[in-house]
Curated annotation (Swiss-Prot):
The UniProt record lists the keyword Signal: yes
EC class: hydrolase
A Pfam family the protein falls into: Cellulase
Function: This enzyme catalyzes the endohydrolysis of 1,4-beta-glucosidic linkages in cellulose, lichenin and cereal beta-D-glucans.
Keywords: Carbohydrate metabolism, Cellulose degradation, Glycosidase, Hydrolase, Polysaccharide degradation, Signal
Catalytic activity: Endohydrolysis of (1->4)-beta-D-glucosidic linkages in cellulose, lichenin and cereal beta-D-glucans
GO cellular component labels: cell surface; extracellular region
Protein name, as recorded: Endoglucanase H
Residue ranges of the region described as Catalytic: 300-630
Length: 900
């Protein structure tokens, strides 16, 4: 409850309250009536208040502090629910500020309450940290300690909710609250809003103090008290509760105030779903029966004597007039078949700036061509507010819906997404709330469309966004979509421009209506740089390996695949271009992928011509269209026999010590490569010990560079780590990558690439990298990769220092070596001592005979391995009659010792 109101706000309150405003939505057709009944809500207290007001309470309000356990609350909760009402608890942490809470000082208490409320099971509306836009509570932003900020409040509120969710207390609904006025430095209505994922309801507290207070309070109408806060909260797509309100008797007509208050709520505050009176004689007499006139007005306003059934606890939106039906994702993918992208249109900065604007006749032409799906990329950034509440421009949302309706009306499976909204990756944690609000509005606008409309969360995330953040984003947005679109199919993908390499690494949410997506533009030099030709056996083998890789992921995870983009620039070799479209589309459709070819409507551009459909002449490139729809038209392909799997080698005993690969004391044996304007050079300079290799590199936006050392012996299976000394020599502290390349499966170029990122600084550092710390390279894999997903240490081709970004710099490296165990990891075994009694005699000979004759039982596999090591006397990795002969000769003293 608000304790005081500054006089400086009073004049502003009166003036602003006189202004009209337009409310949003219409949620209060069944306004819920609630109250703090003036004391803790026992059965008798609830009954007495209901008799007084002449109506059952829908909501019963309770105040507790953070020294109160749920065991104390439970009898009151039982009384509330036995009455058929909802319990709303205002939870006041008098002992803590928001910094304490976010830092975990109250975690034990919060956890205990979460567990107890979960066990209770009934729905509870919980209102923690209320009226924080004031200056009278220890958790408030304006409090005199100045320790609370918007940021610490948000973190504290979210921390509380996260603990409840972690303990499974999903029966608790979260109520965010503001005071009717902002009081104190740094306060605002929405600056401390925790975000839609953490709030189920918003609420406002406000009082008409009349002329009762010494600080100069004056009589205010309901609108003068509540209009400003309501306008702020109405911008959030959450139902609103008037959680505390009341009027004084002194200074005006309380009965009239009550009547006008409820009239205002029902006519102008359409997002308000509940009004909860504060019934107590406290700072002044707030009770509904402070006078007979007030009580009569209150009973009339709430409809005393009317029948009001038990309220539905959780607000739900108006059900759609024609809800989309649930469709199995595999069935949807089969329905989608071959489709197209409406590229460079709604995902341009502004429609028409990259290509011809969308026209309805396009969809007639797509239909005639045979397409079954249309992907409509959409960029929302330039049409969305950059500050809270991040509202999408209505005209643009209407335009997107118009284009979607054109597509759906022709029977197309239609996909809309977030496309080129690259701002999310620049500061994921700072921008995710805006992205969530965008998707909340998309989901709300399109919730009534047919099941043939699919949502794709994000097109081609890349750059600074991590795989973990992409997983988090997919999870967050999916939860938002599911609130209004419970069965709509949603498409998810991985990073690095929706690469197949990252698709197989994404964390798949537990949801039955998902499709995975990937894009394919390989080889990039051909598809985007129009260099060389395409169509060799090896070219096609590479596609088959990649698509089989994706299909295997699909089968393992029982999730269908949408091949969302593929294309070649028009300036590429024409015959090769047609072959590429033909083979790629065949390979995808044969594996059950749905497809959408990339078509951006651009003709004649040297760096952007990927059009198949001419939007002006309404004609298609029929040769490519034929390649897309007719299998095997151009290339002749005979799949290679499946390669013989590499034999599984037995575990090896780790080497002990170190092996120098290059200390740079002789001839420099490193090569280099670069392209797209990037450059690299190497030379011998002074190193950490003796000589080292200096690498000087210049990066560019699309450039690449690297230095490479080809290995004479590529079997590292007995080694545990690789180590080198490195430092930056020009003051730069740029990230670079150290890469291990396997041997190619076809003998051409490299095999699978494995990388580890490092950031050298100006002092020498020894970097030791366990081989288990290398990760499969995501931005590129060569055609010769085996796609095993395992670093094959017995099949290493080369090592590289290479680019990680477009920066320039210089570093020196020295003493590259392999690291083994620090000591012999196997216990000492005496060869020939098969019963391990530290003697070699006839007993051991008898045991060896029995083992060879398979009549010796050794127990566990570990015991057998130990026996075999002692019995393998000629060290040929097998135990046979040759070992028996050696042992006989030793016992007969024909040889003086067993060879080791």
């Amino acid at each position: 409850m608000k304790k005081r109101l500054l006089v400086s706000f009073l004049v502003l309150s009166i003036i602003v309250g006189l202004l009209s405003f337009q409310s949003l939505g219409n949620y209060n057709s069944g306004l819920k009536i609630g109250a703090w009944v003036g004391t803790q809500p026992s059965e008798s207290a609830i009954k007495s208040f209901q008799e007084l007001q002449g109506r059952k309470l829908d909501i019963v309000h309770q105040f507790i502090n953070w020294s109160t356990d749920f065991s104390w609350v439970r009898p009151y909760a039982d009384a509330v629910y036995n009455n058929g009402s909802i319990l709303m608890i205002t939870w006041e942490p008098w002992e803590y500020n928001t910094v304490d809470i976010k830092n975990g000082k109250a975690d034990a208490y919060i956890t205990r309450m979460a567990q107890d409320m979960k066990a209770y099971g009934k729905e509870i509306w919980l209102r923690p940290l209320h009226e924080a836009n004031g200056d009278w509570y220890p958790w408030a932003i304006g409090y005199s300690s100045r320790v609370n900020t918007n940021e610490t409040y948000i973190a504290a509120f979210r921390h509380i909710v996260d603990i409840f969710r972690a303990n499974g207390a999903t029966n608790v609904k979260w109520v965010f609250n503001v005071n009717c006025d902002n009081v104190g430095n740094g306060t605002s209505y929405l600056g401390h809003y925790p975000g839609d994922n953490y709030v189920d309801y918003t609420s406002i507290d406000g009082y008409n103090w009349g002329t009762t207070q010494s600080w100069g309070s004056q009589w205010q109408s309901f609108d003068q008290v509540f209009s400003r806060a309501y306008q702020a909260l109405a911008s959030i797509n959450k139902p609103i509760i008037i959680a505390e309100f009341a009027s004084a008797e002194i200074g005006g007509n309380k009965a009239r105030w009550i009547t006008e208050a409820y009239n205002s709520i029902r006519t102008s505050y359409n997002k308000v779903i509940a009004a909860v009176w504060f019934h107590e004689n406290k700072e002044t007499d707030w009770r509904i029966n402070s006078s007979p006139e007030a009580l009569a007005a209150y009973r009339e306003a709430i409809g005393a004597g009317s029948s009001n059934p038990t309220p539905t606890p959780t607000w739900t939106s108006t059900p759609p007039s024609s809800s989309p039906k649930a469709v199995d994702p595999f069935e949807m993918v089969r329905k989608m078949g071959m489709g197209t992208n409406l590229g460079n249109t709604l995902e341009a900065p502004y429609e028409g700036s990259w290509s011809k604007s969308a026209m309805e006749y396009y969809f007639d032409d797509f239909k005639a061509a045979g397409y079954k799906n249309v992907r409509i990329p959409v960029r929302w950034d330039n049409h969305t507010m950059r500050t809270y509440p991040y509202t999408i421009d209505k005209a643009f949302l209407d335009r997107v819906e118009q284009v979607v309706d054109w597509s759906l009306s022709r029977g197309f499976v239609t996909i809309i997404n977030s496309h080129h909204d690259d701002w999310i990756k620049e500061d994921y944690n700072g921008n995710i709330e805006r992205f969530e609000k965008i998707w909340e509005q998309i989901a709300e606008r399109f919730k009534n469309k047919s099941e043939n409309l699919l949502f794709e969360i994000m097109n081609e995330p890349f750059g600074n966004i991590t795989d973990e953040q992409i997983d988090d984003m997919n999870s967050r947005i999916l939860k938002i979509i599911r609130k209004t679109n419970p069965t709509r199919i949603v498409i998810i993908g991985g990073g690095y421009w929706n690469s197949y390499n990252t698709l197989v690494n994404i964390k798949i949410p537990d949801d039955p209506y998902l499709i995975g997506t990937f894009h394919y533009y390989d080889p990039y030099e051909f598809t985007h740089k129009w260099r060389g030709t395409w169509g060799t056996q090896e070219d096609m083998d590479t596609v088959v390996r990649v698509f089989d890789f994706v299909k295997s992921w699909s089968d393992r995870n029982n999730i269908p695949v949408y091949f969302g983009e593929f294309a070649v620039m028009a300036y590429a070799d024409r015959t090769s271009r047609v072959k590429w479209y033909d083979f790629i589309s065949d390979a995808a459709l044969e594996r059950g992928f749905a497809c959408s070819v990339w078509d951006n409507g651009v003709f004649g551009s040297l760096d952007n011509d990927m059009a198949i459909y001419n939007r002006d002449t309404r004609t298609f490139d029929t040769e490519i269209l034929n390649a897309l729809f007719n299998p095997g038209t151009y290339p002749s392909y005979s799949p290679k026999p499946s390669p013989t799997p590499r034999p599984t080698k037995p575990p090896v005993t780790p080497a002990v010590g170190e092996k120098m690969l290059d200390d740079f004391e002789g001839v420099l044996n490193w090569g280099s490569y670069s392209g797209e304007g990037a450059k690299v050079s190497t030379k011998i300079v002074s190193g950490k010990t003796g000589n080292g290799m200096e690498v000087s590199y210049t990066g560019t936006t699309d450039g690449y560079w690297g230095t490479v050392y080809s290995l004479p012996d590529g079997d590292w299976s007995k080694w545990l780590k690789i180590s080198f000394d490195i430092k930056s020599v020009d003051g730069s502290a740029n990230e670079i990558r150290f890469m291990i390349a396997e041997k190619s499966i076809n003998g051409v170029g490299d095999g699978e690439h494995w990388v580890y990122s490092i950031t050298p600084d100006s002092s020498w550092k020894t970097i030791e990298i366990p081989f288990s710390s290398f990760r499969r390279r995501l931005d590129y894999q060569p055609p010769g990769q085996d796609m095993s997903g395992t670093l094959d240490l017995d099949n290493i081709d080369s090592i590289h220092f290479m680019y990680a970004n477009n920066k320039s710099g210089k570093f020196v490296v020295d003493n590259i070596k392999l690291i083994g165990a620090t000591s012999d990891p196997t216990p000492s075994i005496k060869h020939g001592d098969l019963n391990f009694d530290n003697a070699v005699n006839s007993t051991d000979l008898l045991m060896l005979k029995r083992y060879i004759l398979k009549s010796l039982e050794l127990g566990t596999s570990e015991q057998e391995e130990k026996f075999k090591k002692a019995a393998d006397l000629n060290r040929d990795n097998k135990v046979d009659s040759t070992d028996l002969t050696i042992l006989k000769r030793y016992l007969l003293k024909a040889i003086s010792e067993i060879p080791i």
